[in-house]
Amino acid sequence: MTIELLTPFTKVELEPEIKEKKRKQVGILGGNFNPVHNAHLIVADQVRQQLGLDQVLLMPEYQPPHVDKKETIPEHHRLKMLELAIEGIDGLVIETIELERKGISYTYDTMKILTEKNPDTDYYFIIGADMVDYLPKWYRIDELVDMVQFVGVQRPRYKVGTSYPVIWVDVPLMDISSSMVRDFLAQGRKPNFLLPQPVLDYIEKEGLY
């Protein structure tokens, strides 16, 4: 039997007990989702793929600072439509923090909670090009840019510059909005192919809009 003696000059390589954990890369697409439509899903999926994110959270607002509260249907309907819209789609997940917190949904307050709760996660906050114009007016924006990386997506008729750090992602130009869907329904027109069929079925079943 051979015995190997270790001397003070013997180099011993030790396997690290704890390997550095890879940080999670998570996108967030907030919105009223009144109702959710196909452009929402395309934006979320394209940003996830193009930036190589682990997942994108679809985060419905409870009471947006910029939307008339009277025009927003109850949150349980908006949440159910989101659940129907993303069923079976990999990489898209619903985040209900703002519905649970209630009150006005300021992005700074939400991201402060999420970043403190998940210190191992890098967040990418997705906004339309039309919202980039308003970044200087966002609540506590200078602190918010230290918490998240903003991702701007191109929409029809909007192309802007900004002094804030924004990653731009090109997505298929689909000029669809929730207000367009609501207008179609108010006029008695079916918004076929503008939103997932299960969502449209739910709207008709519940008599929404």
UniProtKB/Swiss-Prot annotation:
UniProt EC number: 2.7.7.18
Catalytic reactions on record: nicotinate beta-D-ribonucleotide + ATP + H(+) = deamido-NAD(+) + diphosphate
Gene3D superfamilies cross-referenced by the UniProt entry: HUPs
Pathway: Cofactor biosynthesis; NAD(+) biosynthesis; deamido-NAD(+) from nicotinate D-ribonucleotide: step 1/1
Top EC category: transferase
A molecular function GO annotation: nicotinate-nucleotide adenylyltransferase activity
CDD domains xrefs: NMNAT
InterPro entries cross-referenced by the UniProt entry: Cyt_trans-like, NadD/NMNAT, Rossmann-like_a/b/a_fold
Pfam families, per database record: CTP_transf_like
Protein family according to the UniProt entry: Belongs to the NadD family.
PANTHER family: NICOTINATE-NUCLEOTIDE ADENYLYLTRANSFERASE-RELATED, PHOSPHOPANTETHEINE ADENYLYLTRANSFERASE
NCBIfam families tied to this protein: cyt_tran_rel, nicotinate (nicotinamide) nucleotide adenylyltransferase, PRK00071.1-3, PRK00071.1-4
Protein name per Swiss-Prot or TrEMBL: Probable nicotinate-nucleotide adenylyltransferase
Lineage, opening ranks: Bacteria, Bacillati, Bacillota, Bacilli, Lactobacillales
